[in-house]
């Protein structure tokens, strides 16, 4: 629920769904589509490796070569997979009772929100962006890409750039940020959301 009570709860006491999407390209309003969603649960201050969601999605359109170079998901790999309209209800159920966690999560949320009318699936959960939280914890750092945040915090992951491994990297970054945020007096979900809003958007 998006109830006010969650806002007063300590970050360490909440349940999260860390997630990432891979897409055909970078322009959701220009018709780009999600081709993979990967997510995993974070609870009691740790990753839940058995509680994951991973789906390939047929976008019904070609994948841009630049995007293919990043995620390695080809047209052949997604052809005949379920359409987004079939996957989003399942994903929504998976993350229903949790705070959504992503790195530059605004990008992923735009892709989800643009589908609201067509699918009737509305993601109204609280959200936290590890990119913004990394900028709060490291105000003098210039770069806050997922790679930069991983380097800063000593997080390593086996395979980068599948949606699920990026979700796992995001979750690990988040858990490493918690004590650094606490040092800055940021303990509750509400405080983390407020601190994120005050940050100028880093590059």
Regions found by a protein language model. Give the residues of each.
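Generic alpha-helical structural context detector
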Residues: 132-135, 151, 172-175
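Short secondary-structure transition/capping segments
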Residues: 88-90, 170-173
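Short, glycine/acidic-enriched loop or turn micro-motifs at the edges of active sites
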Residues: 23-25, 132, 169
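Conserved beta-strand -> loop -> alpha-helix junction used to position metal-binding or nucleic-acid-contacting
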Residues: 122-134
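Acidic two-metal-ion nuclease catalytic site recognized across multiple nuclease folds
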Residues: 1-10, 171, 175-203
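Conserved non-catalytic scaffold segment of RNase H-like nuclease domains
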Residues: 2-8, 12-125, 139-161, 189, ...
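Conserved catalytic/binding loops enriched for acidic/polar residues
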Residues: 166
């Amino acid at each position: 629920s998006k109830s006010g009570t969650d806002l007063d709860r300590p970050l360490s006491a909440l349940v999260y769904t860390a997630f990432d999407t891979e897409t055909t390209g970078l322009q959701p309003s220009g018709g780009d589509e999600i081709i993979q969603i990967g997510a995993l649960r974070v609870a009691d201050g740790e990753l839940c490796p058995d509680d994951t969601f991973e789906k390939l999605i047929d976008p019904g359109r070609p994948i841009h070569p630049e995007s293919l170079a990043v995620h390695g998901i080809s047209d052949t790999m997604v052809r005949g997979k379920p359409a987004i309209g079939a996957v989003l209800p399942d994903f929504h159920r998976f993350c229903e009772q949790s705070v959504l966690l992503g790195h530059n999560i605004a990008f992923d949320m735009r892709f989800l929100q643009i589908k609201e009318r067509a699918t009737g699936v509305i993601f109204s959960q609280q959200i936290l962006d590890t990119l913004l939280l990394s900028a709060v914890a490291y105000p003098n750092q210039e770069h806050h890409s997922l790679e930069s945040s991983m380097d800063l915090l000593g997080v390593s992951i086996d395979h980068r750039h599948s949606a699920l491994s990026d979700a796992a990297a995001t979750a690990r970054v988040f858990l490493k940020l918690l004590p650094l945020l606490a040092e800055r007096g940021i303990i509750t979900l509400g405080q983390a959301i407020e601190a994120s809003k005050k940050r100028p958007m880093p590059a």
